[in-house]
């Protein structure tokens, strides 16, 4: 596929949602996978879209905007082949709509909030994906998880234990520390997409 899939990962509390929202505002990019690509073409830029995830979590649970599904709805859509990517984490199911593939085929930059554990499967399906790892110091992770008030203490401890997952020998991996002010990491994060959208749109062979 000639487009670029940017696969963003990081432990709970690293601030992935906040960074993605920051970059989306900076680029004035859509929070879904539909837009008028011809407008971007006239500007000489590659389209950038931030995928809105399907999650088995209530719509009013806080955090990112997502498509809320029951487990039964999720599994039905998965069986129907409606997801380009899907995984399970901390008792929840996550999916990215298959419309992502048509956008990549048109040369778009598609940004996905992914999972570190699912990275090998994602790389097998999209070998040219651009992986980005967001991190933060352990005490910052705990403080953020406690502040958002979504999890019980035992759940927070479980998420923090998973924060120690290490990624090694990942080609092209971009690492970004988000322990400080959002604007600090946000500028660096946004610059990545500004560079990608200015790149010539690859031509399909």
Where do the model's predicted regions map?
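Short hydrophobic/aromatic beta-strand immediately N-terminal to the Walker A/P-loop
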Residues: 5-7
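P-loop (Walker A) phosphate-binding loop of NTP-binding proteins
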Residues: 9-11
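ATP-binding Walker
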Residues: 14
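Walker A/P-loop
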Residues: 17
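Post-Walker A helix-loop "phosphate-sensing" segment adjacent to the P-loop in P-loop NTPases
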Residues: 25-50
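ATP-dependent small-molecule kinase phosphotransfer cores
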Residues: 42-110, 116
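Small-molecule kinase domains that catalyze NTP-dependent phosphoryl transfer to phosphate-bearing small molecules
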Residues: 147-205
């Amino acid at each position: 596929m000639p487009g670029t899939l940017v696969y963003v990962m990081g432990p709970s509390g690293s601030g992935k949602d906040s960074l993605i929202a920051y970059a989306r505002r900076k680029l004035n990019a859509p929070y879904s996978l539909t837009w008028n690509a011809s407008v971007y073409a006239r500007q000489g830029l590659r389209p950038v879209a931030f995928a809105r995830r399907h999650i088995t979590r209530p719509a009013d649970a806080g955090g990112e905007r997502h498509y809320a599904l029951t487990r039964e709805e999720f599994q039905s859509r998965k069986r129907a082949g409606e997801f380009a990517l899907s995984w399970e984490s901390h008792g929840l199911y996550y999916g990215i709509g298959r419309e992502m593939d048509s956008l990549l085929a048109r040369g778009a930059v598609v940004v996905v909030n992914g999972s570190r554990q699912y990275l090998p499967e994602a790389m097998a399906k999209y070998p040219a994906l651009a992986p980005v790892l967001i991190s933060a110091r352990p005490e910052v992770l705990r403080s953020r998880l406690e502040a958002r008030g979504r999890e019980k203490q035992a759940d927070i401890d479980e998420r923090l234990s998973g924060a120690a997952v290490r990624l090694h020998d990942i080609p092209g991996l971009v690492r970004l520390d988000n322990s400080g002010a959002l604007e600090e990491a946000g500028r660096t994060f946004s610059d990545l997409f500004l560079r990608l959208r200015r790149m010539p749109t690859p031509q399909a062979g």
